[in-house]
Amino acid sequence: MIYCPGRSLLHLPTWADRRRCFERVAASLRSNGRFAWNAFAFDHHVASAIDGQHADTPLPHTNYYSVSDNRVDITLDDGGTGSLWWATKNEWLGLLDVAGLRLEALYGGFDGEPLDDDSREYIFVARR
C-alpha cells in the first residue's frame, strides 16, 4: 500500500505533476496493491465565506482563493506562505485512469461515510 496522507497531493500544482506522481505510484505498486489519499472537496460556499478572512486556528493565517487556478493561497501572520491546488472528483478519477489504476472505494469522510453533496473530504482507495 502507498498512502499519501494529509492532503499532500494538493501540493502538486499541475495536471502533469499529478499524472507523473500517479504513474510512479502505479509502477511502484505490486499487482493488486492499494493506493490511498485524501483531498478536500472544494465548496464554493465555504471558500466565499472565508476568502480573505483572518483565522487563528490551527495557526494565525488568512486564506485567499483563486477559483480560476483551483488554488488557495495561505498566508501566515508570521509571513510564511503556501498554496494548495484542489481537483474535482472527476479529475482524480481521470488520474487513476491514465495511470492504469482502478477505483476500489471513494468515501466522503474518514469514517467511511458515503460521498454526497455535503461531503467536505474525498477519501480515495485505488488498486493496481
Residue positions per predicted region:
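Accessory recognition modules or surfaces
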Residues: M1, H61-L76, D111-R127
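A short SAM/SAH-binding and catalytic strip from SAM-dependent methyltransferases
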Residues: M1-A16
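Short, hinge-like loop/turn segments at secondary-structure boundaries
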Residues: I2-Y3, G52-D56, Y122-I123
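Short beta-strands and strand-loop turn motifs
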Residues: Y3-G6, N38, Y107
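Short conserved AdoMet
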Residues: P13, R30, R128
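SAM-dependent methyltransferase
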Residues: T14, A36-V98
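A short glycine-rich, Lys/Arg-flanked "PGG" loop and its adjoining helix->strand segment in the class I
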Residues: D17-R34
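C-terminal lobe and adjacent flexible extensions of AdoMet/dcAdoMet transferase-like proteins
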Residues: K89-R128
